[in-house]
């Protein structure tokens, strides 16, 4: 039985939203072998008990989900955006990626990009699979004395999904429809993309859209991101224009800082960010976990104070951004135009929570 299924402490990296190490991982985990339980003939690179799949849909228990169930703290996305960590699914509709980021914890050798022959499930099937996988992953917490019964019952009714676990979600051909299918279930969506499919992102309206910007210039991009498509940089630039057009979707640019690789020219980053006119900018530290340890030395992992200093340097060139918030436990800083950063519908007393099947009116 897996550590998640029996309600124990999660082994391996607790990864959330596209590679962030959750608390269980970044505060001491030295293992990084992550894959999926092959429940339905899924990709070969996913084979650990904490990472389950049905066909091309995969889910993993985020370390912060486990922590929240045990009352041991919540993710920075709760602090800044209002996400209830114990009610958040971490999943992906496609375990394939068209980039080979040097800081990625995943195994590039087993991370296929070719999409030929994939039998794509329809969006409703992906939503159903995601919920089933989440319930399976968390089922054992119901017998854990550290987990209050009411908290466990809430976790069995997920209200958020982070479409970010692995691969590049925009390679799934029905991503806009998938987002709407989650919304139809009253589940908020937090989509993380590398920005290489602007034509897809233009059609997507998640609750919050994150795009990774891990280099301020083409040379650094080629060195750090390792894109498998020659026009990836140009596509990322096009995605910035797509984000600028978004009016109903909250937009976030996110940068993973790697010492000696991309921690330079904060003014260039600011100029790049401003092309998108994002609502927020997340700047976080590379975490020395998983397969990235074979590509980078531990010294490439910046300290939290270095992350905050770099974020403040960037903010000097972005006068509209007046707030630099931080969560030391996650080694992340947030640039914002306001202190009111929560998703409006996730604020306490909203209609969203009034409709909740567990805690609603």
State where each predicted segment sits:
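Pocket-edge structural micro-motifs
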Residues: 63, 93, 165, 336-337
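Short, acidic Gly/Pro/Ser/Thr-rich loop/turn segments
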Residues: 96-100, 218, 288, 342
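Short Gly/Ser/Thr- and Asp/Glu-enriched loop/turn motifs at secondary-structure junctions
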Residues: 86, 156-158, 327-331
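Radical SAM enzyme [4Fe-4S]-AdoMet core and its adjacent flexible, acidic
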Residues: 3-6, 12-35, 44-45, 54, ...
């Amino acid at each position: 039985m897996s550590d998640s299924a029996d309600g124990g402490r999660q082994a391996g990296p607790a990864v959330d939203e596209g590679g962030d190490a959750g608390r269980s991982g970044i505060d001491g985990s030295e293992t990084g072998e992550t894959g999926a339980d092959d429940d339905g003939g899924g990709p070969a690179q996913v084979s650990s008990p904490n990472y389950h799949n049905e066909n091309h849909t995969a889910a993993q228990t985020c370390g912060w989900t486990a922590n929240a169930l045990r009352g041991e703290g919540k993710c920075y996305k709760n602090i800044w955006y209002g996400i209830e960590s114990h009610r958040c699914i971490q999943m992906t509709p496609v375990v394939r990626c068209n980039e080979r980021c040097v800081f990625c914890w995943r195994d590039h050798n087993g991370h296929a990009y070719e999409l030929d022959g994939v039998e794509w499930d329809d969006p409703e099937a992906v939503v159903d699979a995601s919920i089933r996988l989440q319930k399976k992953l968390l089922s054992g917490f119901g017998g854990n004395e550290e987990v209050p019964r009411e908290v466990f019952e809430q976790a069995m009714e997920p209200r958020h999904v982070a479409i970010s676990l692995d691969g590049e979600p925009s390679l799934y051909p029905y991503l806009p429809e998938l987002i709407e299918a989650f919304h139809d279930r009253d589940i908020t969506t937090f989509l993380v993309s590398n920005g290489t499919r602007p034509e897809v992102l233009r059609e997507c309206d998640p609750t919050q859209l994150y795009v990774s910007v891990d280099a301020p210039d083409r040379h650094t991009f080629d060195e750090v991101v390792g894109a498998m498509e020659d026009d990836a940089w140009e596509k990322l630039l096009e995605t910035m224009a797509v984000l600028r057009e978004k009016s109903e979707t909250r937009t976030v640019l996110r940068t993973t800082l790697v010492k000696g690789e991309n921690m330079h020219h904060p003014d260039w980053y600011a100029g790049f960010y401003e092309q998108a006119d994002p609502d927020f900018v997340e700047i976080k530290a590379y975490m020395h976990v998983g397969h990235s340890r074979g590509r980078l030395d531990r010294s490439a992992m910046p300290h939290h104070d270095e992350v905050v200093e770099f974020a403040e340097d960037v903010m000097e060139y972005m006068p509209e951004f007046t707030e630099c918030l931080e969560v030391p436990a996650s080694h992340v800083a947030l640039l914002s135009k306001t202190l009111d950063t929560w998703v409006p519908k996730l604020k306490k007393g909203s209609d969203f929570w009034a409709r909740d099947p567990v805690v609603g009116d």
